[in-house]
Regions:
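Conserved alpha/beta-domain cores
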Residues: 1-169
Length: 169
C-alpha cells in the first residue's frame, strides 16, 4: 500500500520494486498475487518488479523467474554465503568468504547469462565490486548491466570498470 501511494499519490512512478529472498517460482507467484491484491501489477503504469538473485535456486531456475520479473539484482553477499556455506560475520568462517571464489563466480556468470538469454537486465549489489576492483572487472567481462558501489570505492572501481570495458571493446 505504501508503494502504491508513493507511485500514484506522490508521483514517483519510476520506483522499481525489488523482491528479496524469493526461493521458488511458486513463492514468486504468491508475492505477485499479494501485490496485485493491493493494486500493484507488473506492467501497469510502468511498474517494474525485480528480484534479488541471491539464492542458488534463483540462478538454477532463472529462466522461470525471468518470466515473472522484469530484472534481477545479484545479492553477492548472500549468494556467496549460500554457495560456500559460510557466514561472513563468523569469526571462524569469515576468512572463507570471498565473492571471487570459483564456485561463486561460476554462479554469477550463469546468472548473467541466464538473465540476458531471457532478455532481462541484471545488476549486482553487495560489497564485492567495491572491495575488489578485479571482481568489478570480471563482472564487466561477463556483461553485467549495473553495479552498486560504496561511495569511498567509486573512483577506484570506475577506473577498473573503464579499463575492463576498454579491453572488451
Amino acid at each position: 500500500r505504501a508503494l502504491k501511494r508513493v507511485r500514484e499519490e506522490l508521483g514517483f512512478s519510476n520506483v522499481i520494486v525489488m523482491v528479496p529472498f524469493c526461493r521458488t517460482p511458486a513463492e514468486a507467484d504468491r508475492v505477485l498475487e499479494a501485490m496485485a491484491e493491493n493494486g500493484l501489477r507488473r506492467g501497469e503504469n510502468g511498474l517494474q518488479i525485480y528480484m534479488m538473485c541471491e539464492i542458488p535456486s534463483n540462478v538454477i531456475l532463472a529462466e522461470q523467474f525471468a518470466t515473472r520479473f522484469d530484472g534481477f539484482s545479484i545479492g553477492s553477499n548472500d549468494l556467496t554465503q549460500l554457495v560456500l556455506g559460510v557466514d561472513r560475520d563468523s569469526g571462524i568462517l569469515a576468512n572463507l568468504f570471498d565473492e571471487r571464489d570459483e564456485a561463486v563466480t561460476r554462479m554469477i556468470s550463469e546468472a548473467i547469462r541466464n538473465a540476458h538469454a531471457a532478455g532481462i537486465k541484471i545488476g549486482i549489489c553487495g560489497q564485492g565490486p567495491s572491495n575488489h576492483p578485479d571482481f568489478a572487472a570480471f563482472l564487466v567481462s561477463e556483461g553485467i548491466d549495473s553495479m552498486s558501489l560504496n561511495p569511498d570505492s567509486f573512483v577506484r572501481t570506475i577506473k577498473a570498470v573503464a579499463e575492463a570495458e576498454g579491453q572488451s571493446g
